[in-house]
C-alpha cells in the first residue's frame, strides 16, 4: 500500500492531495447515511429542477498544498438565513482520530461535515501539532488553525445566538473516557479513523482500546433498540449510531484479515485506492461491514 501511494505521488498526485481526497470521500459516504437518517435533508442538498443535487454541482477542485478548504472544495455552504428558517434535525457526528495518516483522513472528513452543517466532535489523543506523520500533521494543523480563527472571530463579534455560516468542529484533545463516552452517546454517526492499514498485532493500545470498546457499545444499544417496542423504555437509544471506518476497521489487519482485541465492528468501511487482502477474507464482513473502494487516483464525484 505504501509503495502504491508513493507511485501515485511520483506521478504527480501528492500524498497531501490524496489525503484530502480520502477525507472528502469519507465525508461523502457519511453524508449519504446522515441524509437517509434524517427526514430533513438540509438546504445543502436541495434538488434542482432536473433532479440533480446541489452537491453534485459544487466545485470540488483539489486544495493547494498549504491552503485550507475554506471557500473551496467543500459541500455547498449553508447560509445563515437557511439555517435560521429550516427545521433542521440536529445530527451529530463523532470522529475518532488516531495520530497517523488514518487520523488525518478523519480530520479532513470533520472539516467537510462541519461545513455541511453537521455538529462534529473530533476526538484525538494528541493535538494537531503533536501529530508526527505527514501529511496528517500539516493537514490537521491547517484545520485546527481554521477552527481557532473561527472561534476567535465569533468571540470578537460576540455572536452567541445567531446562526453561523458554517458549523465549527468541537475538538476533544486527550479527553477522559467519560468525555469520549458522552460524545459517542449523542452521535448519530461514528467515524473510525484511529488505526489504518499499517496496524498489526493481537492487541490495541490505550486510549484507543477503550475508544473502540465505547464505540462498539453504541452498536450494542442499537441491537437492544430492535427488541424494544416502546421509546419510553430506559434502555432505548434514540440515536442508533452507525459506524463508518476509514480504510479498515481499527484493530483489523488489512493484510491477514485477523482481528485484534478489541476491534471496531463497523457497518461500512471506505477503503482507499484498492481492496486490501484482509478485506476479502470472510472475517471482514463481521468487522468491516459493507466495503466501498474510494478510487482516489482518479477521483471525481
Language-model region placement:
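Anionic-ligand anchoring segments at beta-strand to alpha-helix junctions in alpha/beta enzyme folds, i.e.
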Residues: 25-28, 90-144, 156, 165-177, ...
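An N-terminal, well-structured beta->alpha segment
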Residues: 1-39, 90-91
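Alpha-helical scaffold segments in soluble metabolic enzymes
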Residues: 3, 21, 25, 29, ...
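Intrinsically disordered, low-complexity repeat/linker tracts enriched for polar/charged residues
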Residues: 40-41, 45, 50, 55, ...
Amino acid at each position: 500500500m505504501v509503495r502504491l501511494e508513493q507511485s501515485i505521488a511520483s506521478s504527480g498526485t501528492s500524498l497531501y492531495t490524496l489525503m484530502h481526497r480520502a477525507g472528502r470521500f469519507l465525508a461523502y459516504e457519511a453524508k449519504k447515511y446522515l441524509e437517509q437518517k434524517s427526514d430533513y435533508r438540509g438546504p445543502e442538498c436541495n434538488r434542482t429542477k432536473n433532479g440533480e443535487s446541489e452537491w453534485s454541482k459544487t466545485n470540488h477542485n483539489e486544495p493547494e498544498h498549504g491552503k485550507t478548504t475554506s471557500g473551496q472544495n467543500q459541500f455547498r455552504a449553508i447560509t445563515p438565513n437557511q439555517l435560521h428558517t429550516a427545521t433542521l434535525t440536529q445530527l451529530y457526528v463523532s470522529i475518532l482520530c488516531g495520530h497517523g495518516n488514518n487520523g488525518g483522513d478523519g480530520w479532513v472528513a470533520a472539516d467537510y461535515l462541519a461545513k455541511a452543517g453537521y455538529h462534529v466532535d473530533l476526538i484525538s489523543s494528541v493535538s494537531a501539532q503533536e501529530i508526527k506523520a505527514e501529511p496528517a500533521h500539516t493537514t490537521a494543523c491547517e484545520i485546527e488553525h481554521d477552527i481557532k480563527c473561527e472561534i476567535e472571530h465569533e468571540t470578537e463579534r460576540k455572536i452567541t445566538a445567531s446562526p453561523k455560516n458554517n458549523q465549527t468542529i468541537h475538538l476533544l484533545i486527550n479527553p477522559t473516557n467519560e468525555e469520549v463516552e458522552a460524545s459517542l452517546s449523542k452521535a448519530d454517526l461514528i467515524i473510525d479513523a484511529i488505526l489504518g492499514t499499517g496496524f498489526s498485532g493481537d492487541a490495541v493500545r490505550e486510549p484507543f482500546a477503550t475508544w473502540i470498546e465505547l464505540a462498539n457499545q453504541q452498536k450494542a444499544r442499537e441491537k437492544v433498540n430492535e427488541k424494544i417496542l416502546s421509546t419510553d423504555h430506559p434502555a432505548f437509544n434514540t440515536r442508533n449510531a452507525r459506524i463508518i471506518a476509514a480504510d479498515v476497521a481499527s484493530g483489523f489487519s488489512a493484510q491477514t484479515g485477523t482481528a485484534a482485541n478489541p476491534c471496531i465492528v463497523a457497518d461500512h468501511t471506505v477503503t482507499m485506492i484498492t481492496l486490501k487482502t484482509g478485506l476479502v477474507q470472510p472475517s471482514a464482513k463481521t468487522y468491516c461491514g459493507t466495503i466501498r473502494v474510494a478510487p482516489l487516483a482518479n477521483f471525481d464525484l
